[in-house]
């Protein structure tokens, strides 16, 4: 089941990115290239893409090699249950922001939210079956998607497996 979910997730994510590129090619910005809002949207896009890259590497450091075999509830996984999806969401919205088209940003945000909500729901069924009461407690105490920095916990040492970064 986990392999099927992963394959499907990757296919859907690629289709979504192609759609965003297509939208970016055909959506016109309402702002001139030197206008403040144009520059602000571009800067916002670059910041989100950088946060995506950092956040995905950071999250992968904690889950790498343990996905579907252990329930990781510390590090970025203590902030929200799906940090990889959250940081990918930031990256995709950031790429859309680089088009400086408000339409592209809105479409990207809604499309990614819809896609990830569906994927997360399917993955949660698998995790509930695999980890039972421990996953129920994780659901009860940890936000699903948007991070809450009040609960951050991290062990003193984390073993990294570089091939998963």
Regions found by a protein language model. Give the residues of each.
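Short, amphipathic, aromatic/basic-enriched membrane-interface segments that mark the entry/exit
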Residues: 72-82
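Conserved SAM-binding loop
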Residues: 80-81, 86, 90
């Amino acid at each position: 089941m986990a392999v099927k979910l992963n394959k499907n997730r990757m296919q859907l994510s690629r289709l979504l990115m192609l759609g965003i590129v297509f939208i970016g090619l055909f959506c016109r910005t309402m702002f001139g290239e030197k206008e403040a809002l144009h520059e602000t949207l571009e800067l916002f896009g670059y910041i989100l893409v950088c946060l995506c890259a950092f956040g995905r590497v950071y999250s992968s450091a904690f889950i790498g090699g343990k996905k579907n075999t252990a329930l990781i509830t510390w590090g970025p996984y203590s902030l929200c249950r799906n940090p990889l999806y959250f940081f990918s969401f930031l990256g995709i919205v950031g790429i859309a922001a680089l088009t400086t088209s408000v339409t592209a940003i809105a479409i990207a945000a809604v499309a990614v939210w819809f896609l990830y909500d569906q994927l997360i729901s399917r993955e949660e069924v698998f995790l509930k079956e695999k980890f039972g009461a421990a996953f129920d407690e994780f659901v009860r105490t940890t936000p699903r998607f948007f991070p809450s920095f009040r609960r951050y916990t991290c062990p003193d040492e984390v073993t990294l497996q570089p091939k998963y970064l």
